Amino acid sequence: ALFSLPALFQVKNKFIEILESDVVDFPGLWLVKNGQSFQSEHPQKALETKAGPCYYEQYVTKRASYIAETTGNRNYPWRIFAIADQEKELITNQLVYLLATPAVEDDYSWIQPGLATLDWWGRRNIYGTDFTGGVNTETHKYFVDFNSRYGLKYFVLDDGWSDACDLKKVNENLDLNELSRYAQERQVGLVFWVHAYALKQDVSGYLDFLQSVGAKGIKVDFFNRDDQDAVNLFHQIASEALKRKIVIDFHGI
């Protein structure tokens, strides 16, 4: 069995959480069950990939015999063993943040934490209205109204708001400019689902477009990897999003 981090173990009367921090230009760490114990493993560097339909998936078809190509004069990721008497104590553990490279920016006041709704299931189950539920302006305004009424910070437009291959090809039933105006008036932030490998084709261009239609965040899905190339893509997306003050939910890693 293969396990990604964070991983939590109970050893007698203690809880041990294994984490990592400062993973830059390097693959993530996995745990492999080996009998009664676990051993660590890194995904090897991808040499060749094969794209699925419209970049909806990207499969590694050939890997190297090594895990990374990087410089020797650098720091490598921290491995953390967080130990607690009770599970709840791990929630406030700050080691991941304390061991990470300090942030390049000093103002993150624009990042507003908050609860979100999304339309993935809900848009299929809206009844008793004068419109048909689905991926359309009326349904999304309905969600925005719900958020505004109950003080929920974000509304996530999930898969279907655009073409999966080209994020600029917006669903013809959706007026993003009108929705953005409507959401802004009600102080609800719009978060857009994007496929990682569609976004990869033009990270800065697509983020410029999303910013222009009022995006406050993106939900990035279907990386399905954390080898060196994937980790570098995480950082590229995060860096470009930071420039535009767009928050990120890295969803499918």
Predicted feature locations:
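N-terminal accessory beta-strand-rich subdomains and adjacent acidic, glycine-rich linkers
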Residues: 1-103
